[in-house]
Amino acid sequence: MKDTEKKTEKELVWDECVDILENVKANSFKATLEYYLASDKKTKKAKPAKVKKVKEPKAKAVKPEQVKPTKTTKAPKPKKPKKQGGLISQWKEKLEAPYRTPYVEQKQGMVISIDKMWKHVHGEDSKEQIAILSDVSLEIGYGEIVIILGPSGSGKTTLLNLIGGYDSISLGSCVVANCPLEKCTTEQLLTYRKLNLGYVYQRYNLIELLSAYDNIAISQNLIPKEQRHLDIEELAAKLDIKEILYKFPYEMSGGQKQRVAIARAIIKEPRLLLCDEPTGALDSNSAENIIALLQAINKEYKQTILMVTHDETLTRIANRIIKISDGKIVSNELVRPLS
């Protein structure tokens, strides 16, 4: 993956849902990033060009005596239409090929395998490179709840973004769900995220113009109908948001918004749920409810959960606690093995 300009959280959310907005119930939604980011710019619709009517020349009448008799011949046999299946499958193959992710084997039971991974950024002097993650090696098993602790600027969110395929790896390897992220193109990373990831942000990042139902439906539409096992209304009932399902984000409390964001993340049944400070913007009661909810989700859906946080109280639900300082893992402890 090539280095790209750092995107805002809202732009990352937009990248994840822009391809499937046409499937959402809100017909009035204007699918442009500028409108989503509350830009004042207005786009003008181009007027259709006027098409001049062309008069067709009248056919000249032919007198009967001018028509010469012709010899009767046998009608040719109709040619069998050529089969188009081969061409269609080739065309489909060309369209899908750029999005097909590479595959490598992992140890049995492992969902994340990181080996000597580095992340460099350019400093104020463009010639100088600064390491914000250094020589990170890590293995995480399916179904673990992993808490990543560390002070601000230690590299916690960078690690989460690299695992999520939102940032490029400078050196080393990062294999998630058999997909080597360092070898992926931008298109392949999009497929990787659609198939494997759910992301919960600190500031919820719900689309303000859509109801809770439609915010969740955006994520559900990333997977084919035949692969959907969760119903939005049933999931909403489990997450205690059924009463606000058709309300808009501005009508919700912080805790309700975070529950909708979690529902949006897990509706497509991802293998990995990434949470960036999931309780950071909540009061203590709402935070406790979200902690209990994440624990219940892990138990019921067997999803691996990675949480970046400053809140050490979250460690009580962890299987694994990772501490990061100055871009290095200083501690990686399995505190509660999976049963």
From Swiss-Prot:
Mention one GO molecular function: ATP hydrolysis activity
List compositional bias (Basic and acidic residues) regions by residue number: 54-68
Family annotation (Pfam families): ABC_tran
TM region positions: none
**In this protein, which residues make up the domain named ABC transporter?**
112-338
Matching entries from PROSITE patterns are given as:
ABC_TRANSPORTER_1, ABC_TRANSPORTER_2
Q: Does the keyword ATP-binding apply?
A: yes
Alphabetized InterPro entries for the sequence: AAA+_ATPase, ABC_transporter-like_ATP-bd, ABC_transporter-like_CS, MacB-like_ATP-bd, P-loop_NTPase
Q: Which UniProt keywords apply?
A: ATP-binding, Nucleotide-binding, Transport
Which portions of the chain have biased composition (kind: Basic residues)? 42-53, 74-83
Residue segments, region Disordered: 41-87
- Binding-site residues, ATP: 150-157
Family, per entry:
Belongs to the ABC transporter superfamily.
Q: What is the name listed in the Swiss-Prot or TrEMBL entry for this protein?
A: Putative ABC transporter ATP-binding protein MG467 homolog
